[in-house]
UniProtKB/Swiss-Prot annotation:
The reaction(s) this protein catalyses: Hydrolysis of Ala-|-Gly bond in repressor LexA
Protein name as it appears in the record: LexA repressor
Matching InterPro entries: LexA (IPR006200), LexA-like (IPR039418), LexA/Signal_pep-like_sf (IPR036286), LexA_DNA-bd_dom (IPR006199), LexA_repressor (IPR050077), Peptidase_S24_LexA (IPR006197), Peptidase_S24_S26A/B/C (IPR015927), WH-like_DNA-bd_sf (IPR036388)
Similarity comment: Belongs to the peptidase S24 family.
Enzyme Commission number(s) of this protein: 3.4.21.88
Gene that this sequence comes from: lexA
Coiled coil: none
Keywords: Autocatalytic cleavage, DNA damage, DNA repair, DNA replication, DNA-binding, Hydrolase, Repressor, SOS response, Transcription, Transcription regulation
Cleavage, annotated site positions: A95, G96
GO biological process: DNA repair; DNA replication; negative regulation of DNA-templated transcription; proteolysis; SOS response
Role this protein plays: Represses a number of genes involved in the response to DNA damage (SOS response), including recA and lexA. In the presence of single-stranded DNA, RecA interacts with LexA causing an autocatalytic cleavage which disrupts the DNA-binding part of LexA, leading to derepression of the SOS regulon and eventually DNA repair.
Length: 206
């Protein structure tokens, strides 16, 4: 098996399979260099071109990290890469400023497209333990679909006093209740609130 590949190409192929299997998306070229011990990205690109030419992978040059691992005979393997979107990680939220303003974005994180249901999705780091009963802990990352409205029971990111907070949303008779999922904390009652988006996912570092 792999008689037509050199040692580095085999290492790259195995590394990409492992990363896609574990994470759901392929590594970057720089990550490939570090994992295999290559000194330059141009060398890695050369090996990737050979792997593509020999039918082991398929690439889309118009998209970042767009690589599919193919089995021999050009049949798709279980390691097929789904399209990846680089989702912005928002570091701060300021009243009167678009949430995705360049100055608000600290970094980006690649997520499979089926995990992201809107181009205006962003990621926010959770501060505090007000949502622990919903499995959302301090320093978790919440995936947020940007929208200005919410239904009762939605977990939302709301702007209060120039600060973003994650709570469950309830519109009641004469106020809005932002309910924490922590029995030791009281709800926040307000006449009106700015909704920045609805939480659609959560992940954390272990």
């Amino acid at each position: 098996m792999y008689e037509d590949l050199n040692d580095n190409q085999i290492k790259i192929l195995h590394y990409m399979k492992s990363e896609i299997s574990q994470k759901g998306y392929p590594p970057s070229v720089r990550e490939i260099c570090q994992a295999v011990g290559l000194k330059s990205t141009s060398t890695a690109h050369g090996h990737l071109s050979k792997l593509e030419l020999k039918g082991y992978i398929r690439r889309d040059a118009t998209k970042p990290r767009a690589i599919e691992i193919l089995s021999q005979g050009d049949e798709q393997s279980p390691y097929i890469h789904k399209e990846i979107i680089n989702v912005p990680i928002v570091g701060k939220v300021t009243a009167g400023q678009p949430i995705l303003a360049v100055e608000n974005i600290e970094d980006t994180f690649p997520l499979p497209i089926d995990f992201v249901d809107s181009e205006s999705t962003f990621i926010l780091t959770v501060k505090g333990d007000s949502m622990i009963d919903d499995g959302i802990h301090e320093n978790d990352y919440v995936v947020v679909r940007q929208q200005s409205d919410a239904r009762n029971g939605d977990i939302v990111v709301a702007l209060i006093d120039d600060s973003a907070t994650v709570k469950r949303f309830y519109r009641e008779k004469d106020h809005i209740r932002l309910q924490p999922s922590n029995t030791s904390m009281s709800p926040i009652l307000v006449d009106d609130v700015t909704i920045l988006g609805k939480v659609t996912g959560v992940f954390r570092k272990i």
